[in-house]
């Protein structure tokens, strides 16, 4: 009886261990708070308006599931928050990956820019429901010293020095990825776009180099911008457009998620199986992993890592 009791206790203890995460590695990155230096247009395409993209970089040191993000920007004074009707997020590798190389020559440089095209499996859009968002007013009257809106031109007309100051409502958009984004370790650009009925969203700059409460990292690159006339190229907001003795900018955003240190390697035959095994061990089972990472179900988690593992 004593032996049976001991075995039952051991089995029960093992079950508790399996139901508890072996380790928890939350991920959080932020560029900090807006510095009032510049507002750069980041706009979804709409009738009569060019798509315009502003992007800034971040680094992942391990495979990471990104479950949410925030962005901070300026909308026109008096604009209801409900007029923010669509948000899309794309992730880019750093040039020359996913790009034509040598590039077109239509911009001063492509070194350290976002790639020509986005990572297809990492695009999320509130339209089809792969992200949802909420908006809050941070400051009803916020000013920036300069803006970049329309003056996004091929060289030699790239230097406009900006389009002057602006005042508007400072808003934060909190984004939840209903299909979380799974990325291997690497250097990336984060590109949000916002559609505002009756106005535009000016993505607000943050200090560069990053200062508290931001998350500094070695290799921080400056922000880039393009519109549909400039595709597939990008311009540096500071060096190429503002120019002179140019400041360089970060943009105000944050990312939240969890790392998966023992995930498989994309393109390898055992990637999916190794990743799922790592998740089960890390979170104490796949149901707990799906819940903690923000997936709607175990099937959704499996699909997310299947896409991650494709070369």
Predicted regions and their residues:
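Bacterial N-terminal signal peptides that target proteins for export
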Residues: 1-10
């Amino acid at each position: 009886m004593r032996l049976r009791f001991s075995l039952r206790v051991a089995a029960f203890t093992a079950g508790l261990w399996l139901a508890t995460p072996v380790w928890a590695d939350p991920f959080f990155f932020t560029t900090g708070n807006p510095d009032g230096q510049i507002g750069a247009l980041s706009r979804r395409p709409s009738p009569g308006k060019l798509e315009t993209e502003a992007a800034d970089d971040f680094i992942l040191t391990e495979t990471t599931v990104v479950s949410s993000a925030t962005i901070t920007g300026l909308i026109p004074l008096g604009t209801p928050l409900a007029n923010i009707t669509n948000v899309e997020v794309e992730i880019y590798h750093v040039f020359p990956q996913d790009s034509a190389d040598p590039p077109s020559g239509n911009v001063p440089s492509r070194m350290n820019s976002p790639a020509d095209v986005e990572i297809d499996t990492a695009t999320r859009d509130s339209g089809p429901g792969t992200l949802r968002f909420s908006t809050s007013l941070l400051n009803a009257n916020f000013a920036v010293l300069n803006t970049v809106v329309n003056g996004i031109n091929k060289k030699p007309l790239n230097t406009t020095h900006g389009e002057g100051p602006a005042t508007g409502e400072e808003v934060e958009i909190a984004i939840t990825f209903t299909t979380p984004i799974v990325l291997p370790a690497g250097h990336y650009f984060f590109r949000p776009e916002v559609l505002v009925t009756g106005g535009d969203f000016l993505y607000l700059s943050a200090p560069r180099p990053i200062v508290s409460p931001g998350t500094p990292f070695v290799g921080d690159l400056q922000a880039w911008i393009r519109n549909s006339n400039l595709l597939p190229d990008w311009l540096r907001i500071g060096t190429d457009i503002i120019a002179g003795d140019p400041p360089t900018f970060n943009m105000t955003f944050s990312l939240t998620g969890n790392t998966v240190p023992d995930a498989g390697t994309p393109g390898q035959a055992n990637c999916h199986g190794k990743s799922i095994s790592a998740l089960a061990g890390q979170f104490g089972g796949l149901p707990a992993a799906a819940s903690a990472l923000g997936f709607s179900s175990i099937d959704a988690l499996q699909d997310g890592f299947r896409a991650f593992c494709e070369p």
